[in-house]
């Protein structure tokens, strides 16, 4: 097959991975993709707010152990390189098992050290369930998220919020920079010592070396013998019946 792919396939597509670069999708639709190298030009042309006010990672998508570990690798760099995070930053783990395991392995510590706030393992900012800190809930502004939807008003009820979708590690980098036009591949940041530093490519672990762990999985096993269990339902209940 590898020696003569055209014999087995109708079409052969070759992708040069060295030419790929991070993208941001949005605003107002996940279908509008812009590579980070072109974001400055697009933002200026379209009048998108360049300041990143909030970075949001997690939810039911892009919140696996590997996702969190890659975001944490960027956070660890910010700590080591003395970079101050310029935007509000929240983390929503994908499950209690993921949360417990990334806490055990130190990833949440790194994310919290840069100012990250860990939210509940549930629907949150993705569908507007959060207390956003803002001095004007109706102003034109930009946020970046690793969620899979960014339609108008979805995240905070404000039709002027420009939400851009990216990978958790890119969201983290942009929260550190506070700038939508920041290109982590080519651009440097100034740390608290006044030094110019660059972020290294993220790293992560596909699976935890010590395995997954959870203290309370939220599951209660049924009784071995349920014949003596009585379920009480009001005789006049209009919602439940046996």
Q: Where are the regions a protein language model picked out?
A:
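Mobile "lid/hinge" segments at catalytic clefts and subdomain interfaces of large enzymes
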Residues: 1, 83, 117, 124-219
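Accessory "access/gating" subregions that flank catalytic or transport cores
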Residues: 1-135, 139-142, 228-242
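Long, charge-rich low-complexity segments
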Residues: 208-237
């Amino acid at each position: 097959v590898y020696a003569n792919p055209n014999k087995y396939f109708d079409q052969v597509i070759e992708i040069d991975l060295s030419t790929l670069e991070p993208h941001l999708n949005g605003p107002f639709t996940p279908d509008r993709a812009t590579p980070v190298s072109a974001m400055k030009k697009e933002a200026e042309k379209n009048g998108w707010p360049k300041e990143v006010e909030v970075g949001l990672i997690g939810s039911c998508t892009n919140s696996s152990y590997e996702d969190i570990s890659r975001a944490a690798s960027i956070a660890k760099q910010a700590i080591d390189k003395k970079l101050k995070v310029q935007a509000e930053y929240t983390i929503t783990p994908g499950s209690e098992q993921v949360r417990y395991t990334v806490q055990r392995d130190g990833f949440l510590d790194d994310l919290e050290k840069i100012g990250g706030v860990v939210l509940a393992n549930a629907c949150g900012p993705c569908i507007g369930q959060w207390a956003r800190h803002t001095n004007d809930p109706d102003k034109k502004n930009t946020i970046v998220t690793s969620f899979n939807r960014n339609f108008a008003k979805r995240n905070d009820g404000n039709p002027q919020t420009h939400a851009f979708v990216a990978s958790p590690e890119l969201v983290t980098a942009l929260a550190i920079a506070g700038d939508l036009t920041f290109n982590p591949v080519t651009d440097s940041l100034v740390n608290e010592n006044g030094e110019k530093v660059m972020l290294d490519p993220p790293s992560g672990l596909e699976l935890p070396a010590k395995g997954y762990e959870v203290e309370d999985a939220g599951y209660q096993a049924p009784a071995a013998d349920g014949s003596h269990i009585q379920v009480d339902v009001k005789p006049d209940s209009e919602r439940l019946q046996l």
